[in-house]
Amino acid sequence: MKIAVMTDSTSYLSQDLIDKYNIQIAPLSVTFDDGKNFTESNEIAIEEFYNKMASSQTIPTTSQPAIGEWITKYEMLRDQGYTDIIVICLSSGISGSYQSSYQAGEMVEGVNVHAFDSKLAAMIEGCYVLRAIEMVEEGYEPQQIIDDLTNMREHTGAYLIVDDLKNLQKSGRITGAQAWVGTLLKMKPVLKFEDGKIIPEEKVRTKKRAIQTLEKKVLDIVKDFEEVTLFVINGDHFEDGQALYKKLQDDCPSAYQVAYSEFGPVVAAHLGSGGLGLGYVGRKIRLT
């Protein structure tokens, strides 16, 4: 048995990790109304993307990997001698990536494809990839890995803030926000992932209060966890994310592992300006 681990591009793993563990990536993409396309990779300058989004008159559209893209990756790994492929995907609640990866796996012969719905995005999705790789190295079988990731998912989550709900509403990536329409003037929405979907959690008066709310909600959840990895995931307001990262490093118990990451184009397109996330995993994740 030889097991590969792959993912889609919204896990936002560093190129060093991709190269070190030979992780195959199925890229998602973003397209603007003038035809400008950003296919996700570590070569994209995220500042250029945010500038383009700010100057665009319409919300960009996102595209999941085509089934053919998944099939090509699976066949390549099969031809390299892999018998099984663990595939970690962006939440099925906001993308069809999981469904297309699963369907492609049903169409490929000679290799067993095990698709896993992270029900999250960005580097929290990436944590499942890194955990799966660690378990492959330790000799676990595919079903044992999927079972462990499923258990890990019960102790994993994320909260988000954005400047407004415009992008999320127009892209259809938020659930249950209708009652908030027209009520967010001078208010900041606090959101969370619940069962793979982004839902409204709370409205607060200022960005400062919104960031404090992120921190309080997450730290209240993880206070009884034996192990914790926290992720500050930053958007285009660089200083806010850096300040929260430093504060958590200073404030959290030594048992906590605090890491920093950034949103890539696809998730940034859904969130719009001012996106900032704080995610948690009830494990110590190997990040190198």
From Swiss-Prot:
GO molecular function, one term: lipid binding
Residues binding hexadecanoate, per UniProt: T62, S95
Gene3D superfamilies (UniProt xref): 3.30.1180.10, 3.40.50.10170
UniProt entry tagged with the keyword Nucleus: no
Record domain DegV: where: 3-282
InterPro entries, alphabetized: DegV, DegV_C, DegV_domain_contain
Any matching Pfam family: DegV
Keywords in alphabetical order: Lipid-binding
PANTHER family xrefs: DEGV DOMAIN-CONTAINING PROTEIN DR_1986-RELATED (PTHR33434), FATTY ACID-BINDING PROTEIN TM_1468 (PTHR33434:SF2)
Annotated function: May bind long-chain fatty acids, such as palmitate, and may play a role in lipid transport or fatty acid metabolism.
Protein's recorded name: DegV domain-containing protein SACOL0812
Organism: Staphylococcus aureus (strain COL)
